[in-house]
């Protein structure tokens, strides 16, 4: 199984709280993969640039990417994005642009999106998601 970690879950994991996130990671099977979207990676880098300790933040991100692979765009992401951006707009229920890209990246891989931002992501009915904070 591929598990794509949303930005909030990555931050929880880096801070080791809530501890249940690390516990869930430790319970994964050997063939399970932890990944993050390039969008999540960009959000982390943006946060590092805005932090008071840039070098420490960048080092923490580098260590994280040794365990969680960063995945980059493909054509399928764009197809899902086009579909869901229009579907949600027509429903009058759009979500944040970065969240939409992350969701579409997970859809393109048939991955389970791990997030605490359930309110936004549950609008995308094709998306598999789990909240590991519960």
Curated annotation (Swiss-Prot):
Its EC number is 3.1.-.-. Transmembrane segments: none annotated. GO terms for molecular function: magnesium ion binding; RNA nuclease activity. Changing residue 37 to G/N: Loss of toxicity. Residues 3-132 form the PINc domain. HAMAP family: VapC_Nob1. Toxic component of a type II toxin-antitoxin (TA) system. Acts as an RNase. Its toxic effect is neutralized by cognate antitoxin VapB1 but not by non-cognate antitoxin VapB2. Forms a complex with VapB1. This is Ribonuclease VapC1. It comes from Haemophilus influenzae (strain 86-028NP). The gene is vapC1.
């Amino acid at each position: 199984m591929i598990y794509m970690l949303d930005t909030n879950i990555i931050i929880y994991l880096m801070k080791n709280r809530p501890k249940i996130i690390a516990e869930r990671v430790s319970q994964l099977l050997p063939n399970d993969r932890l990944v993050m979207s390039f969008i999540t990676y960009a959000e982390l880098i943006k946060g590092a640039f805005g932090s008071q300790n840039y070098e420490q933040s960048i080092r923490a991100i580098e260590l994280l990417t040794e365990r969680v692979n960063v995945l980059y765009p493909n054509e399928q992401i764009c197809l899902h994005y086009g579909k869901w951006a229009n579907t949600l707009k027509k429903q009058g229920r759009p979500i944040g642009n970065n969240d939409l890209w992350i969701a579409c990246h997970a859809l393109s891989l048939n991955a389970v999106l791990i997030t605490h931002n359930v309110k936004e992501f549950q609008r995308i009915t094709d998306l598999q998601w789990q909240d590991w904070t519960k």
